[in-house]
Structures are given as structure tokens and as C-alpha cells.
Amino acid sequence: MNIKSFLNNRLWKNNSSLVQLLGLCPVLAMTTNAINAIGLGMTTTLVLTITNTIISSFRKIIPKDLRIPIYMMIISSVVTSIEMLLHAYTFNLYQSLGIFIPLIVTNCIIVGRADLIAYKSSIVESFFDGIFIGLGSMFAMFAVGSIREILGNGTLFFGANKIISNIHSSVFFTLLDKKFTIILAVFPPGGFLILGFLIAIKNFIDLYYKKNTIKNIEQCSCSNKIK
């Protein structure tokens, strides 16, 4: 396994939110601030990692014709367990995420990776696939959530005590004065615009890198011909 290619594919090249555009409903609904984005991203990553590992462990005994219902049973069991843990230990985060915790069961990313990777790959590969696909999605959610929070409320990391309970609720950064904020950013249309902006930036970076790579190859081939 090429580790660099493995990481690049999952974190950047085939990012589930910025490239495959999977699971956009929770991405846009729960990224009104950075903390909610981190909370949902961590929960999704945990579900991905656990379900991938379980499905890969039992892949040889899961009947091919019944695999989708079995995936859903495993995923729903894992999500329910994590939901109960969030309710018990991080109640504020549980309240903020609300209905979007159980809706992780229907997230296309989870089912897609289960069938594409976990059902066909080793436990180790499936485990790390879950981690890095989840981190890639969390990175996108965090970027969208941070920009929306800064533009819409002028703050960053407001409500950090939802994740780290011993932090006081007054601990956050104020980056913009209220009179300079753009209220559209915290509403769904603003979320769509910011997500589109991030996708455009990613595509620009990819295109720039591709052009430079082609230019370097052409220069190398020309220098070899001269020699």
C-alpha cells in the first residue's frame, strides 16, 4: 500500500464533502459554527471507523445478497451506542447536533465505504480508511463552519465547552465586530455559497498543481533531448 497515495485520496483527491459531495444535508445544516462542525465530524469519523472495522472483520461470512441490510443493522447499532454516550457525557453537544446524530445511519459516506472498502479489504486498511475518510469530511465541515461563524457572528470556537467540558462558555475568539457580520452566512444559502467557494478553491489548487507538473515534465523531456 502506498501510504502517500492512500492519504491523498481520502483527505484531498476524493474528499467525501468537497469532491464526492456526499452527506451534504448534515454538512450544511450543522456547520453554522466551528464547534458543531467538529462535533459532527468527530462523531461521523468514529462511526466510519467502527463500522468499517466490524464489517471487514465479518466480511467472509456476510452473504452478498443480504449485505446492505446487514450494513444498516451494524451502522444503526454503532450510531445508537455513540448517541447514548454523547447523551451521557457531552449533553450540550448532543443537544446541538440533535436529529443529525441518528441521521448518520443514512449517510451515504458510511454505507458507501462499507460496501466499497470494508467488504473487500483487510481489517487494517478498512480501519484507516474510516479514520481518514472521516477526517477529510471533518476538515471540510470545519472549514465551512469556521467561515460561516466568523462571517455570520464574528466569533470562532464559540461554545467550545460543548466538546471540552472544563472550558468556560466565555472562552472563544472575537474576530469581527457585530456591525461587520453578514447574517446570510449562518443561513442555508450562505452555507451553499461558502461550500461552493471552497470547492472552487480546491479545484483551482488541483488545476495549478496539474499545470506545474505537466510543465516540469515537458522541461525534463526537452532537456533530455538536448543532451
UniProtKB/Swiss-Prot annotation:
One of its GO terms (biological process) is electron transport chain. GO terms for cellular component: plasma membrane. Its EC number is 7.-.-.-. It is found in: Cell inner membrane. Keywords: Cell inner membrane, Cell membrane, Electron transport, Membrane, Translocase, Transmembrane, Transmembrane helix, Transport. InterPro entries: NqrDE/RnfAE (IPR003667), RnfE (IPR010968). The chain crosses the membrane at residues 34-56, 68-88, 91-111, 127-147, 181-201. It is a multi-pass membrane protein. The keyword Manganese does not apply. Pfam families: Rnf-Nqr. The keyword Electron transport applies. Part of a membrane-bound complex that couples electron transfer with translocation of ions across the membrane. The complex is composed of six subunits: RnfA, RnfB, RnfC, RnfD, RnfE and RnfG. Belongs to the NqrDE/RnfAE family. This is Ion-translocating oxidoreductase complex subunit E. The gene is rnfE.
